[in-house]
Amino acid sequence: MIIHVTYLSGYLAAIISSIIVSAILGLPLTPERPARHSWTPSAIFPTPVIALGLTAISIKLGVTGIYGADLGAVAGVLSAIMTAYFLEDIFPRPEDS
């Protein structure tokens, strides 16, 4: 197999849990229009991307959890909290030119 089922279930759990938790925390589902000039964090981007990155880093370090889904769920919750509360502190908004 190209990718193990444990890893795939972890990635899917990370995507689903990050979108659900970020929607519960009040992030909009999509960024404001026009999307390419928007700096508004949303439930669709960058939350699942950060969750996938955290899951991939954890798997590469050898932490797989029980079935991978628990690791993905934890990464999804952490990425949603980070996006909702800390993202603009880490990456400030660009200045308008």
Swiss-Prot record:
Keyword Transmembrane helix applies: yes
Membrane topology term: Multi-pass membrane protein
Any Pfam family: NiFe_hyd_3_EhaA
Signal sequence interval, chain numbering: none
GO CC annotation terms, alphabetical: plasma membrane
Main location: membrane
Annotated InterPro entries: Prd_NiFe_hyd_3_EhaA
Subcellular location: Cell membrane
Keyword Transmembrane: yes
Ranges that cross the membrane: 7-27, 43-63, 71-91
Keyword tags: Cell membrane, Membrane, Transmembrane, Transmembrane helix
Assembly and oligomerization: Putative multisubunit membrane-bound [NiFe]-hydrogenase eha is composed of at least 20 subunits.
Family: Belongs to the EhaA family.
Protein purpose: One of the integral membrane subunits of multisubunit membrane-bound [NiFe]-hydrogenase eha. Eha is predicted to form large electron transfer complex and might catalyze energy-driven reduction of low-potential redox carriers.
Descriptive protein name: Probable [NiFe]-hydrogenase-type-3 Eha complex membrane subunit A
Native source organism of the sequence: Methanothermobacter thermautotrophicus (strain ATCC 29096 / DSM 1053 / JCM 10044 / NBRC 100330 / Delta H) (Methanobacterium thermoautotrophicum)
